[in-house]
Amino acid sequence: MTEKKTGGEKLLYCSFCGKSQHEVRKLIAGPSVFICDECIELCNDIIRDEIAGSVETEGVKGKLPTPHEICQILDQYVIGQAQAKRNLSVAVYNHYKRLRHLSGRQDEVELSKSNILLIGPTGSGKTLLAQTLARLLNVPFVMADATTLTEAGYVGEDVENIIQKLLQKCDYDVEKAQQGIVYIDEIDKISRKSDNPSITRDVSGEGVQQALLKLIEGTIASIPPQGGRKHPNQDFIQVDTTNVLFICGGAFDGLDKVIRNRTEKMGIGFGAEVKSRQGKNLTETFRQVEPEDLVKFGLIPEFVGRLPVVATLQELDEDALIQILIEPKNALVKQYQKLFSMEGVDLEIRPAALHAVARKAIKRKTGARGLRSILEAALLDIMYDLPQLDGVEKVVVDENTIEEGSKPLLIYAEQPKVSGSN
C-alpha cells in the first residue's frame, strides 16, 4: 500500500521500502506508486556499479582495440618511438585476445603471454608510454618501481606487493586482477652487481630477480587481505599471475659498452674485418642488443628468458624534443600557456627559445624529462611577479631568456585615452 489514512491525515508511503513521507526527505509520485529519495540513491549506486563493471570487462568481451587504434592513441601523447609503440600495441592487443580466448571454450592450443622489456635512455618516453597505456586500457593497470623491491624478509617491498597494488586497483576483485597489466620501471637497477657470485647476499639485485621469476612466468601469489602484513594463521587471497602481462623498462646505462665489446671485437691478420668504433649513436647500438648482452649486464639468464619481446627506444634529438614541447595533447608549452591564461595573460615561446630548451636538455643528457625543469627555471621569476603586475597582456620568451637567464619581454595592454575637458 502507498496510501494510508491516520487521524484524518492521508499518509503516503514509498512503494519500495515502505517508509512514510515523514521518514524521508522526498517522496516522488508516479502512476499509483511512490519512490523515496533513499531508494533513488540506492538505484543510482546499483546502476553505477553495473556500468563500471561493464567498462572494466569491455576489453575482454567487447570490441577489441586493434594495434593500429592503440598506436594512434599513443601517438597523441608520445612523440616518435614508432617501433616501441608497435611492440606495445601488438602485445596489448594479443593480451586482450588471450583473455577472450580464456573466457571462451577451452581449446587444445594454450596461448602463452609475451612479456616485454623496454630499453631506452633516460627521458626517451618509457614511463610515459606506460602511463598513456594506463589511461586507454580497460583492464587493471599498475606501475611499480624496481628500486624499492627487496627479497622477502628484508627491509623494503617484496615482489608480492606489486600484485597487492593490482588487487587494490580493482577493489580486491581477484578475477579482474588476474587479467591485469603490470609495468615495472627501473628494471636495470636490480641487475647483478658482479659477474661472479658473491659470498654476501644481494637482496636488492639478483635476489629480486629470483623473486620476480615465478611471478612473471605465472604462480599463485598469497596476498594478505586489505594490505595487511603477513602473519601465521591468516587467510590469504590467492592470485594466479599466469595471465598478468608484465612490461619492464629501464635505461640500462652501460649496456651500450657491453654491446660494442661484443660487436666490435677486432680480428688479427689479413682476413680480419675492419670495423670503425666511430659514428654509432646510442640508438643504433641498442638495436643490436642480444640476450647475452643483458646477461653480461647483470640480468640472470632465467629472467631474460621470461621477457621474450625486447623493444628499444631511440635517443631523442633536438627536433624530437621540440615536437614534444609543442605537439602532444598535454604538451609542456600548452600547459604553461594554460597557467598564464588563468592570469589573463598570453604566453609566447619563440622558436629560437624552443631550440635553446632542446639543446640544453641534450647537453644535460636528461632527454624529455629535463624539459620541464628548464622551462620552470626560465619562467619562475615572471610567474612570481605576474599576479602583482597590472596591465600585462602578453609574455614573450626568447632565446636569451633560456640561455642567459634574462627576463622575458612583457607587452602591456594599451590604456584607453581619456579626452580632457576644455
From Swiss-Prot:
One of its GO terms (biological process) is proteolysis involved in protein catabolic process. ATP binds at P121, T122, G123, S124, G125, K126, T127, L128. InterPro entries: AAA+_ATPase, ATP-dep_Clp_protease_ClpX, ATPase_AAA_core, Clp_ATPase_C, Clp_protease_ATP-bd_su_ClpX, ClpX_bact, P-loop_NTPase, Znf_CppX_C4. Zn(2+) binds at C14, C17, C36, C39. Coiled coil: none annotated. Keywords: ATP-binding, Chaperone, Metal-binding, Nucleotide-binding, Zinc. SMART domains: AAA, ClpB_D2-small, zf-C4_ClpX. PROSITE patterns: CLPX_ZB. Gene3D superfamilies: 1.10.8.60, ClpX chaperone, C4-type zinc finger domain (6.20.220.10), P-loop containing nucleotide triphosphate hydrolases (3.40.50.300). GO terms for cellular component: HslUV protease complex. Residues 1-55 form the ClpX-type ZB domain. GO terms for molecular function: ATP binding; ATP hydrolysis activity; ATP-dependent protein folding chaperone; protein dimerization activity; unfolded protein binding; zinc ion binding. PANTHER family: ATP-DEPENDENT CLP PROTEASE ATP-BINDING SUBUNIT CLPX-LIKE, MITOCHONDRIAL, ATP-DEPENDENT CLP PROTEASE ATP-BINDING SUBUNIT CLPX-LIKE, MITOCHONDRIAL-RELATED. ATP-dependent specificity component of the Clp protease. It directs the protease to specific substrates. Can perform chaperone functions in the absence of ClpP. Belongs to the ClpX chaperone family. Component of the ClpX-ClpP complex. Forms a hexameric ring that, in the presence of ATP, binds to fourteen ClpP subunits assembled into a disk-like structure with a central cavity, resembling the structure of eukaryotic proteasomes. This is ATP-dependent Clp protease ATP-binding subunit ClpX.
